[in-house]
Amino acid sequence: MTDKIRTLQGRVISDKMDKSITVAIERKVKHPIYGKIIKRTTKLHVHDENNECKAGDLVEIRECRPLSKTKSWTLVAVVEKA
């Protein structure tokens, strides 16, 4: 059983927690009736072991086992500093 590990890129919107960040994932979807492409945003709590991220950074994250009630993603790399 080879499951592909989910990785996403997003923008850090909060780094006020210890060893945790909040990342906004933006995706574009087509409206079911009107057909217009619209933006949808999902907020995820991400584990940041070394507190290396600041608000505004572009980061790559991957899914992992649940670390707390709301955290099941971990930081892979900082793609671009703010």
Swiss-Prot record:
Repeat listed as a keyword: no
GO CC annotations, alphabetized: cytosolic small ribosomal subunit
Pfam families linked to this entry: Ribosomal_S17 (PF00366)
BP term (GO), one: translation
Keyword line: Ribonucleoprotein, Ribosomal protein, RNA-binding, rRNA-binding
PROSITE patterns for this protein: RIBOSOMAL_S17 (PS00056)
Domain of life: Bacteria
Molecular function, one GO term: rRNA binding
Subunit structure, as described in the record: Part of the 30S ribosomal subunit.
Functional description taken from the UniProt entry: One of the primary rRNA binding proteins, it binds specifically to the 5'-end of 16S ribosomal RNA.
Family, similarity comment: Belongs to the universal ribosomal protein uS17 family.
Protein name: Small ribosomal subunit protein uS17
Organism for this UniProt entry: Aeromonas hydrophila subsp. hydrophila (strain ATCC 7966 / DSM 30187 / BCRC 13018 / CCUG 14551 / JCM 1027 / KCTC 2358 / NCIMB 9240 / NCTC 8049)
Gene transcribed to yield this protein: rpsQ
